[in-house]
Amino acid sequence: MKTGRISQIMGPVVDVRFEDGHLPEIYNAIRVSHKAESESEVDIDLTLEVALHLGDDTVRTIAMASTDGVKRGMEAVDLGKPISVPVGNVTLGRVFNVLGDNIDLDEPLGVEAQRDPIHRQAPSFDQLSTEVEILETGIKVVDLLAPYIKGGKIGLFGGAGVGKTVLIQELINNIAQEHGGISVFAGVGERTREGNDLYYEMKDSGVIEKTAMVFGQMNEPPGARMRVALTGLTMAEHFRDELGQDVLFFIDNIYRFTQAGSEVSALLGRMPSAVGYQPTLATEMGQLQERITSTNVGSVTSIQAIYVPADDYTDPAPATTFAHLDATTNLERKLTEMGIYPAVDPLASTSRALAPEIVGEEHYAIAREVQQTLQRYKELQDIIAILGMDELSEDDKLVVHRARRVQFFLSQNFHVAEQFTGQKGSYVPLKETVKGFKEILSGKYDHLPEDAFRLVGRIEEVVEKAKEMGVEA
């Protein structure tokens, strides 16, 4: 391993000069270690990543942690390979940083743990699976109206407090319980408090044993925030490629990945592009997203929380992400106010899998009829608000009558929320979901009260709930 010396420090950007014609490759990791020699100094153990070559002997690097205490002239060792992180079953139930060091309170992983580099090529064409397979989540509104594809990419939109985290936890739980699947969670540039809460909530609900967690939070340098998504993805890829698993990969928040890339780009002196973003925005996003896919041995399905700056969907950051998405799940605050959980907007959420050749004719027809009924109800709400229900035609009254039952039946209790609600969570198989909505739309349950449809799983539970309320089916 060749050693060089630090020649310049500009915040998170560090220049390192090497002798004897040695120049580390782009993406190589460089380690700076220094023992404190006096009380005024601090121990330093810093990892840098090569970003640029400057001339014949100097590299410009991005620091993965704070550069406080680093001085010119300090020794830097080229490790000869990219940053590598632990992979495999040893990562389950644990929390890591961008470098793969555990940041939970348990024992560190031993040196025998297998480690993989975070930079790698996307699977080649001959490795990709050509089958489009639906990933059943057990969540009615998702499975019926915006189904997820195995190996697909799903965008999760929602403001603060509308249930993104609970939806993520339920997906992790359902995949673990029903499919025996594994999840990897990457916290990219979000609040440390939220990561802490998520960890303890997952511990309480028992989901943590099937999950690996990686965090590079808001307070960390841009290098860590930019690379932590790749750290999580590398762990997920190992479960897919080596263990043949169907993996769920969560990124919260993909916008912060772009934001960190923009900061790094500016620090490296690149000319900014549209709205001040990095000129390499599309390339960086593509390199990450192309690795998330189904292969012949397994799949990585990603669910990405997306922050939309100033609600501007034409902003280059979210717009670049949209190009890669197969489905969107939009969470709507108005639905939480009505007590409908999960608060997924059935009209705004989309999926390219909702096509008759993928989901089947019956599923497609029922889903479209549900959307048409809800859309008509939405159009009638203004008339109802001004004139009242009595002014509607008999046909429109029937639409409203059924739409409200459909809307309430799209809600259900979650397993991970049992400790808060006291209600047992429900996993609803896709066949049962389609059957339930088909019967509601046919008018079979028009005589049952609306509240019987609220927060239940299968259609049989509606009948039981109505009986408890004194109404016979």
Curated annotation (Swiss-Prot):
Q: Can you say where in the cell this protein is located?
A: Cell membrane
PROSITE patterns registered for this protein in UniProt: ATPASE_ALPHA_BETA
Provide the alphabetized UniProt keywords.
Answer: ATP synthesis, ATP-binding, Cell membrane, CF(1), Hydrogen ion transport, Ion transport, Membrane, Nucleotide-binding, Translocase, Transport
What is the topology of this protein in the membrane according to its UniProt annotation?
Peripheral membrane protein
Q: Which InterPro entries match?
A: AAA+_ATPase, ATP-synt_VA_C, ATP_synth_F1_bsu, ATPase_a/bsu_AS, ATPase_alpha/beta_chains, ATPase_F1/V1/A1_a/bsu_N, ATPase_F1/V1/A1_a/bsu_N_sf, ATPase_F1/V1/A1_a/bsu_nucl-bd
Its Enzyme Commission number?
A: 7.1.2.2
Which Pfam families does the record match to this protein?
Answer: ATP-synt_ab, ATP-synt_ab_N, ATP-synt_VA_C
Annotated Gene Ontology cellular components are: plasma membrane; proton-transporting ATP synthase complex
Q: Which GO terms describe its molecular function?
A: ATP binding; ATP hydrolysis activity; proton-transporting ATP synthase activity, rotational mechanism
Q: Any idea which positions bind ATP?
A: G158, G159, A160, G161, V162, G163, K164, T165
Can you state which reaction this protein catalyses?
ATP + H2O + 4 H(+)(in) = ADP + phosphate + 5 H(+)(out)
Which domain of life does the protein's organism represent?
Bacteria
Please give the subunit comment from the record: F-type ATPases have 2 components, CF(1) - the catalytic core - and CF(0) - the membrane proton channel. CF(1) has five subunits: alpha(3), beta(3), gamma(1), delta(1), epsilon(1). CF(0) has three main subunits: a(1), b(2) and c(9-12). The alpha and beta chains form an alternating ring which encloses part of the gamma chain. CF(1) is attached to CF(0) by a central stalk formed by the gamma and epsilon chains, while a peripheral stalk is formed by the delta and b chains.
User: What is the annotated role of this protein in its UniProt record?
Assistant: Produces ATP from ADP in the presence of a proton gradient across the membrane. The catalytic sites are hosted primarily by the beta subunits.
HAMAP family with a match to the protein in the record: ATP_synth_beta_bact
Q: Which PANTHER family match?
A: ATP SYNTHASE, ATP SYNTHASE SUBUNIT BETA, MITOCHONDRIAL
The record's similarity note reads: Belongs to the ATPase alpha/beta chains family.
Q: What is this protein called?
A: ATP synthase subunit beta
Organism name: Bacillus pumilus (strain SAFR-032)
Task: From the UniProt record, report the name of the gene that encodes this protein.
Answer: atpD
